[in-house]
């Protein structure tokens, strides 16, 4: 049993190393570099007479990539720099700083799929495994996005497979 685990670990590290050679090492974006647009949303309209204060941002990033392990980590990466405050890491139920994001250690060990057009990322933590979180997270993101970018302008909606 221990030999199997050891061989799995060796294989995993080998695959991660190969992908790091292809895609490069990921670093943390410093605050001095701006690689994206930030759209501030103060409120959303619920109907003609009602507004709800939200005070959130929608981030627009050109030519970036998204990596997720579908549970704890979502990394938004541009030019091999992970973007803090947009990327997400929740480890054992606790939100952590960007320095804990998995891609900084293991890279992005998946084949990159390219999409021509606008992609709205709807991935986040438990939404892949929990129907309530899926609806709660997705609907909120769609409503926020609609305030700045009409959903008909989105070519792809990136959600978890499950």
Where is each model-derived feature located?
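Catalytic donor nucleotide-activated moiety binding site of glycosyltransferases and closely related
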Residues: 158-162
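Phosphate-centric recognition/catalysis
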Residues: 2-140, 146, 150-156
């Amino acid at each position: 049993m221990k030999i199997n685990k050891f061989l799995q670990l060796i294989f995993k590290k080998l695959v991660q190393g190969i992908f790091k050679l292809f895609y490069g090492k990921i670093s943390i974006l410093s605050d001095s570099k701006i690689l994206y647009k930030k759209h501030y949303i103060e409120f959303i309209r619920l109907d003609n007479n009602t507004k709800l204060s939200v005070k959130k941002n929608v981030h627009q990033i050109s030519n970036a990539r998204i990596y997720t392990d579908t549970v704890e980590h979502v990394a938004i990466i541009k030019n091999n720099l992970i973007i803090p405050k947009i990327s997400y890491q929740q480890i054992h139920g606790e939100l952590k700083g960007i320095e804990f994001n998995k891609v900084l250690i293991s890279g992005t060990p998946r084949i990159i799929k390219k999409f021509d057009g606008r992609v709205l990322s709807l991935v986040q933590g438990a939404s892949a495994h929990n129907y309530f979180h899926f609806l709660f997270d997705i609907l909120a993101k769609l409503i926020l996005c609609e305030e700045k970018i009409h959903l008909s302008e989105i070519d792809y909606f990136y959600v978890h497979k499950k």
